[in-house]
């Protein structure tokens, strides 16, 4: 039976052998005793807060889910409903592109708004208001188009109902998880960067993974409904012509590699979830922070293969 230590040892050996530029790794897996976990971790660099990049999109999904649980938003209602009269806060005369009046928060969080906006390192400052620029562009229907601007716009819409999203997440998500004084980058207009700009330690990112694995409950306290954690790895949007691990996308989650699904940020920030029935310890979460953009996919594939190998040795 594999343990957190056996998983950790195998992944550490692989990282050291391949030269993957890891900052830290945290492994959490269930034990044979009901309701208990086994945990192990290793650090190669000082355990300080670093940006988790697109892994922050999972936090945005949790924020939207909490607001939906409160009855403040409906993820399947057109966002035009929330923008009527108030706009985005920075302007009330908001112009929507053709077809955008039918776009919902779910579409924005699953990257299926059909609005095309290529990524730019300076996108938060390229326009007076990124969300307004995004929404004025036409929608091609329910077409997958990955864009940081999509998540950013979702959080701007959410802001019309919950107030400052950073404050809302701090109170309703970070505080129950024991996360204090978390920094989240803001745009020039004062709104959180949403799908990027969030800085966490390896173990802090792992706490979010723990919450997601346990379907919205931590230490017996429900923070968000299970359906929003499930939405990160169900109802996949299928993609064609892409590499392994990028063929399926849900609400912030990528399907694969292999038996895994994951939240994946640039430069190797990953929450790798193994919840298959084939696992002898279903519920394993491997958290990785790194500075190795091009080696991350191979490392995730190794983790998937190693979990399968350790299962076969049981």
What is the predicted role of each segment?
Residues 70-111, 160-200:
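Active-site helix/loop module of the DD-peptidase/beta-lactamase fold
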Residues 2-46, 272, 282-287:
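A short, well-structured edge-of-sheet supersecondary motif
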Residues 297-314:
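Short, gly/Ser/Thr-rich active-site loops of penicillin-recognizing serine hydrolases
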Residues 46-47, 115-197:
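Catalytic-site signature segments of enzymes, centered on catalytic residues
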Residues 12, 65, 80, 106-109, ...:
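Non-transmembrane alpha-helical segments in soluble domains
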Residues 153-157, 196-217, 269-291:
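Active-site-proximal alpha-helical segments within enzyme catalytic domains
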């Amino acid at each position: 039976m594999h343990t957190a230590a056996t998983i950790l040892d195998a992944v550490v050996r692989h990282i050291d052998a391949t030269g993957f530029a890891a900052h830290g790794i945290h492994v959490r897996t269930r034990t044979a005793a009901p309701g208990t976990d086994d945990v192990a971790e290793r650090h190669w660099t000082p355990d300080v807060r670093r940006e988790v990049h697109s892994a922050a999109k999972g936090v945005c999904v949790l924020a939207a889910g909490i607001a939906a649980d409160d009855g403040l938003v409906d993820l399947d209602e057109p966002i035009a409903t929330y923008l009527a009269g108030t706009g985005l806060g920075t302007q009330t005369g908001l112009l929507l592109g053709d077809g955008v009046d039918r776009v919902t928060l779910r579409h924005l969080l699953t990257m299926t708004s059909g609005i095309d906006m290529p990524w730019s390192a300076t996108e938060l400052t390229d326009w007076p208001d990124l969300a307004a620029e995004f929404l004025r562009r036409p929608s091609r229907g329910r077409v997958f188009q990955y864009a940081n601007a999509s998540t950013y716009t979702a959080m701007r819409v959410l802001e019309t109902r919950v107030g400052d999203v950073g404050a809302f997440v701090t109170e309703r998500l970070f505080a129950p998880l024991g996360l204090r004084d978390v920094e989240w980058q803001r745009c020039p207009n004062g709104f959180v960067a949403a799908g990027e700009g969030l800085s966490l330690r390896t173990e802090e990112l792992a706490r979010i993974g723990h919450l997601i694995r346990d379907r919205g409950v931590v230490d017996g306290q429900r923070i968000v409904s299970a359906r929003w954690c499930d939405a990160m790895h169900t109802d996949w949007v299928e993609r064609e012509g892409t590499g392994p691990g990028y063929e399926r996308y849900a609400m912030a989650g990528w399907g694969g590699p292999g038996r895994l699904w994951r939240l994946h940020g640039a430069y190797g920030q990953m929450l790798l979830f193994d919840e298959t029935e084939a696992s002898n310890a279903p519920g394993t979460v491997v958290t990785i922070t790194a500075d190795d953009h091009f080696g991350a996919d191979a490392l995730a594939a190794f983790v998937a293969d190693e979990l399968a190998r350790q299962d076969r040795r049981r």
